[in-house]
UniProtKB/Swiss-Prot annotation:
Protein's gene: Slc6a13
Name assigned to this protein: Sodium- and chloride-dependent GABA transporter 2
Reported tissue expression: Expressed at high levels in liver, followed by kidney and leptomeninges, and very low levels in the cerebellum (at protein level). In the brain, detected in some blood vessels (at protein level). In the kidney, expressed in the cortex, including parts of the proximal tubules, but not in the medulla (at protein level). In the liver, highest expression in periportal hepatocytes, with highest density at the vascular side (at protein level). Also detected at low levels in other organs, including skeletal muscle.
Family: Belongs to the sodium:neurotransmitter symporter (SNF) (TC 2.A.22) family. SLC6A13 subfamily.
Glycosylation site residues: 169, 173, 178, 269
Phosphothreonine sites (modified residues): 587
Positions bearing Phosphoserine: 591
One of the protein's GO biological processes: gamma-aminobutyric acid import
Topology in the lipid bilayer: Multi-pass membrane protein
Alphabetically ordered keywords of this record: Cell membrane, Disulfide bond, Glycoprotein, Membrane, Neurotransmitter transport, Phosphoprotein, Symport, Transmembrane, Transmembrane helix, Transport
Extracellular face of the membrane: 142-206
Membrane-spanning residues: 41-61, 68-88, 121-141, 207-227, 233-253, 282-302, 319-339, 366-386, 418-438, 453-473, 490-510, 528-548
Length: 602
């Protein structure tokens, strides 16, 4: 199937015209940027994919789902879904030289909704993910003290049920069912001032508001100059967390009880593989930790030079990401093993996931260490950096998509900076609802529904179908060969064609069947309207794909067959193997002649 001439107008619509060059200097449009070198791209992607999930989610899932046995489903999903989709999105951005929306428009206009779905997810992610940074900053600032404030029960926010840390053989009576620890009271009564439900949002926590404002200011100045500033910032934000992680790892494995914790982390329980939930956890973890279906990889790849070897980069980055998750497990569970031994309780009682690990379990363990404020500062500084580069790359993804949709509007001097400011301000004000006394319940809604594995799996199904079956896996492989000089491992193509959509569809259907309404802390049940709001958040992204396809089919003129032909044909100015890249803009006359020639063929 040949290509059909098409182009992009200033308002973002696709029309069948002859290719035009993106660089339009006459109207003041700036040339699209590129990375100064490969290292900036690699570190930017590493900063995006290596985030909080590597530290607070993967180790817990590994322990929960059979220890070392969990690596079997994890590796299967890694090679059938993770690496293929990761490579697909990165190569797509590099090939089309476009962001997360227009890249899909240029290879298959009927599936442009994939881009809108991914940007809807990343927009919601931008609102709530940075709230974790606000919490981490609050803890970081609270750590600059001689005695950590969550280490004792002598503060004004503590209750009479507060029981300080102690070993099991201490004489104090701790049998009360209402007994709580100072770290939990610090988290719920000092940091969050948690209300009794989502129906009681209460007042704003102004200390957290200032922390959120600081986080957004840092995020803004990390990307305000585009890849020129992002490429420099990631040299620090993407590498320094590794230093912190190594320091915490060395400290953890030298503690008494560390071996017990690591044993719980890795000891294989093969019988857990018969539980379908283990496989679903492995699949969703791959999508979470590899930043798949968010448009971020497409945006970052679009700033590569055309002949960059993105295949080699993607394989190396995927290995780095999984290795980091594995190493983080040693750092976390060595500390949890120490805490388990010190308190004389089973490790199952101290193992936590998500915010519970970062703001309850680990702070509790830190108090037991000598020089505890130092280790608290190291840990929360690492959390801030891990979350920061993931956050600003997500914002960069959204901004890149908008700029590429409307280049004549935003690709002009200082307008991009204004756009980033607008996105940051809007996201900041929406995020304030999560800093109220009931804000934690709203945060959990966003985390459970808005960027859930269900949404990401749904988008991944259509991504693989679009590239492999509509655009053509063979054609895309030829495009990749034209870029990097050779064809990648053939298994990746077959994953796009068969394994990836099948595995994603099966996991998606299973997640629907096994769906359980959200609860907070296994105690609070959300009202019906809370779950309804959550489903609206989830559907807001998934509905974009079918809705866009129906909209384009209804608005285009002509017979259905002709409309379908126009909507599945890629842009004419996309470079093809053994064909020279376009070197000059087309005129209206050549556009008309070209359209006549291609009237019956794509």
């Amino acid at each position: 199937m040949e290509n059909r001439a098409s182009g992009t107008t200033s308002n973002g619509e696709t029309k069948p015209v002859c290719p035009a060059m993106e660089k339009v200097e006459e109207d003041g449009t700036l040339e699209r940027e590129h990375w100064n070198n490969k290292m900036e791209f690699v570190l930017s992607v590493a900063g995006e994919i290596i985030g909080l999930g590597n530290v607070w989610r993967f180790p817990y899932l590994c322990y929960k789902n059979g220890g070392g046995a969990f690596f079997i489903p994890y590796l299967i999903f890694l090679f059938t879904c993770g690496i293929p989709v990761f490579f697909l999105e990165t190569a797509l951005g590099q090939y089309t030289n476009q962001g997360g929306i227009t890249a899909w428009r240029r290879i298959c206009p009927i599936f442009e909704g994939i881009g809108y779905a991914s940007q809807m997810i990343v927009s919601l992610l931008n609102v709530y993910y940075i709230v974790v940074l606000a919490w981490a900053l609050f803890y970081l600032f609270s750590s600059f003290t001689t005695d950590l404030p969550w280490g004792s029960c002598s503060h004004e926010w503590n209750t009479e049920n507060c029981v300080e840390f102690q070993k099991a053989n201490d004489s104090m009576n701790v049998t009360s069912e209402n007994a709580t620890s100072p770290v939990i009271e610090f988290w719920e009564r000092r940091v969050l001032k948690l209300s009794d439900g989502i129906q009681h949002l209460g007042s704003l926590r102004w200390e957290l508001v200032l922390c959120l404002l600081l986080a957004w200011i840092i995020c803004y100045f990390c990307i305000w100059k585009g890849v020129k500033s992002t490429g420099k910032v990631v040299y620090f934000t993407a590498t320094f967390p590794y230093l912190m992680l190594v320091v915490l790892l060395i400290r953890g494995v030298t503690l008494p009880g560390a071996a017990q914790g690591i044993q719980f982390y890795l000891y294989p329980n093969i019988t857990r593989l018969w539980d379908p939930q283990v496989w679903m956890d492995a699949g969703t973890q791959i999508f979470f930790s590899f930043a798949i279906c968010l448009g971020c990889l497409t945006a970052l790849g679009s700033y590569n030079k055309y002949h960059n070897n993105c295949y080699r980069d993607c394989i190396a980055l995927c290995i780095l990401n999984s290795s980091t998750s594995f190493m983080a497990g040693f750092a976390i569970f060595s500390i949890l093993g120490f805490m388990s031994q010190e308190q004389g309780v089973p490790i199952s009682e101290v193992a936590e996931s998500g915010p519970g690990l970062a703001f309850i379990a680990y702070p509790r363990a830190v108090v037991m260490l000598p020089f505890s404020p130092l280790w608290a500062c190291c840990f929360f500084f690492m959390v801030v950096l891990l979350g920061l580069d993931s956050q600003f790359v997500c914002v960069e993804s959204l901004v890149t998509a908008l700029v590429d949709m409307y280049p004549r509007v935003f690709r002009k001097k200082n307008r991009r900076e204004v756009l980033i400011l607008i996105v940051s301000v809007i996201s900041f004000f929406i995020g304030l609802i999560m800093l109220t006394e009931g804000g934690m319940y709203v945060f959990q809604l966003f985390d459970y529904y808005a960027a859930s594995g269900m949404c990401l799996l749904f988008v991944a199904i259509f991504e693989s179908l679009c590239v492999a079956w509509v655009y053509g896996a063979g054609r895309f492989y030829d495009n990749i060969e034209d870029m990097i000089g050779y064809k990648p491992w053939p298994l990746i193509k077959y994953c796009w064609l068969f394994f990836t959509p099948a595995v994603c569809l099966a996991t998606f259907l299973f997640s629907l069947i096994k769906y359980t309404p959200l609860t907070y802390n296994k105690k609070y049940t959300y009202p019906w309207w809370g779950d309804a709001l959550g489903w609206l958040l989830a559907l807001s992204s998934m509905i974009c794909i079918p809705a866009w396809s129906i909209y384009k089919l209804r608005t285009l003129k002509g017979p259905l067959r002709e409309r379908l032909r126009q909507l599945v044909c890629p842009a004419e100015d996309l470079p093809q193997k053994n064909q020279p890249e376009p070197t000059a803009p087309a005129t209206p006359m050549t556009s008309l002649l070209r359209l006549t020639e291609l009237e019956s063929n794509c």
